[in-house]
Amino acid sequence: MKKGVLLNADVSAVVSRLGHTDQIVICDAGLPIPAATQRIDLALTQGVPTFLQVLGVVTQEMQVESAILAEEIVKQNPQLHRALLAQLTELGQHQGNTISVSYISHSAFKAQTEHSRAVIRSGECSPYANVILCAGVTF
C-alpha cells in the first residue's frame, strides 16, 4: 500500500507525470469537463469531498508555481475565495515560494481547461469553486 497522503491512483499518476508549467484543474461538481481531457471524478454526493479537501491532498504532492481562478469567485463566493487564498499562501510558505494567483473570466477559465492534463472533480456545490494549478519544479 502506498505510504503517502495521496491514495487515489489516477490522481497520483497525473501528479507524478507533471512537468514545469503543466496544468491540472480541481473543480466543483458543475464545471463542464472537455471530452478530450482526462476526467478524474471523486464526487460521491453533494459536498463530498469538498473542493478544499481535494485541493489540500493534491497539493501535498504537487509543487505549485501559480494558480488561475475565475474572477467571479471574488463576489459570488467570497468565503471560499478567502479560504482558497489562505490555503495557497500556506502552501507557498511550506514550499518556500510565492504562488502567483491570476484571475480570468469564467468563460476563459472553461476554455483553459482544455489545455490541462486532467480535471479532478470534487463534490463541491458552491459557485466558482474551481482552480487551475500550474506545476512548478522542486529545484
From Swiss-Prot:
Catalytic reaction(s) noted: beta-D-ribopyranose = beta-D-ribofuranose
Residues that, per the record, bind substrate: D28, H106, Y128, A129, N130
EC number: 5.4.99.62
A GO cellular component entry from the record: cytosol
Gene encoding the protein: rbsD
The organism's place on the tree of life at top rank: Bacteria
Pathway per the UniProt entry: Carbohydrate metabolism; D-ribose degradation; D-ribose 5-phosphate from beta-D-ribopyranose: step 1/2
Official protein name in the record: D-ribose pyranase
Quaternary data: Homodecamer.
One Pfam family in the UniProt entry: RbsD_FucU
Entries under InterPro entries matching the protein: D-ribose_pyranase (IPR023064), RbsD-like_sf (IPR023750), RbsD_FucU (IPR007721)
UniProt function note: Catalyzes the interconversion of beta-pyran and beta-furan forms of D-ribose.
NCBIfam families, A to Z: PRK11797.1 (NF008761)
Entry annotation: catalytic residues: H20
Root EC class: isomerase
GO biological process, any: D-ribose catabolic process
Principal cellular location given in the protein's record: cytoplasm
Keywords, sorted A to Z: Carbohydrate metabolism, Cytoplasm, Isomerase
Family label: Belongs to the RbsD / FucU family. RbsD subfamily.
Single GO MF descriptor: monosaccharide binding
Protein's cellular compartments: Cytoplasm
